[in-house]
């Protein structure tokens, strides 16, 4: 990606699955927001609209996979990188760990190629090659199965990217990241057959049988908004009446809170909201015009001590909730709402004190979840079925604090026991579950409506 950008070529990156961290690195390398393609969270129609719309904006597109090529939900390939490639009719470049192998690699790559005959594996990049002799052995092995080798990456410790328990360290926290990115681009030009790779990444909308349909792709949010509003004509009329009202929706964003899909603020802006960013770690009050607050996920545990000392920020969140103003929180944002947060050393740090729990490290909770709302709340309605993703290592211990909300929904997933989770009331949604609003467009619509109502109530009170 960095090599293409250094040549002045526009490239749109995508990431398979619900990841928040890899997209930050890809966005930094391309200079454009990275878009997640998740069949399980968003469904195939959204994935198609998103891919074709954003890939139409620039000459090149690259989709980074997730896990192994065929790894999807549970033991299946549902939602996998292969499923995305088949859905979008894209060629696949297989990154192969080649260290300590030679002829065996031919069997492995042939297995990947033949496992799904409809999949077009256009070539491989060999990673971890030790010597020129090793490279020759590998290339002959690939030649024996007629598999093009489009790159050879030697063992190089400088390529390793720093990581922690939930994934790679974001670019904003990596030392000398711009210089590192430039060096990576130079090495890519040296080790990869860039001309052939750039040809593979050329806008697929220009050379596939579905060209007419793909070139008519809409902005996915506009398309989704039109779809959901057409189902609710009464709501569509109300939306038109509210179009001149622009409530302020504040989104937390700093080192502690940055797990936010680019579509989240785009949805709110498309619905007529004014979006403002707010850094809790800077210990500041919420913007005066704040009609609704969004607390996304992130790493509050790494800044637990600093957050606990941000009395103005924590007090602002508490006051926001006591006034009954809308608040939407996911995962790390949920942690901020508890009574206490225990850091890695077991030291307790006071949080905003909105919800009756203290949080401490626990077992890994990871995977897609089907969510069934138990009651109506800020953004949920009984009878709906939603898909989300859970990824954390926390357990919550209830405290005797005053009950502020009811349990939100029942979660089910592959290989895990069903359980009731989250908090909700008319002005609050707080849960471990990450949602992508491309798969549940009613959520931002309801949040916007709540912000409009809160704004109107405030103006009436002031008058």
Model-based region annotation:
Residues 300-377:
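Cysteine-nucleophile active-site neighborhood
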Residues 15-16, 149-157, 274-282:
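Beta-strand->loop->alpha-helix junctions that form or flank phosphate-binding loops
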Residues 159-207, 230-235, 240-241, 245, ...:
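Amide-donor transfer/coupling interface in amidating biosynthetic enzymes
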Residues 62-64, 93, 125, 294-296, ...:
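Structural motif
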Residues 2-88, 96-119, 132-136:
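ATP-dependent carboxylate-amine ligase catalytic core
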Residues 102-209, 219-236, 242:
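Internal gly/pro-rich beta-alpha loop/helix module
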Residues 1-16, 123, 133-139, 265, ...:
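N-terminal phosphate-binding or glycine-rich loops at protein starts, especially the Walker A/P-loop
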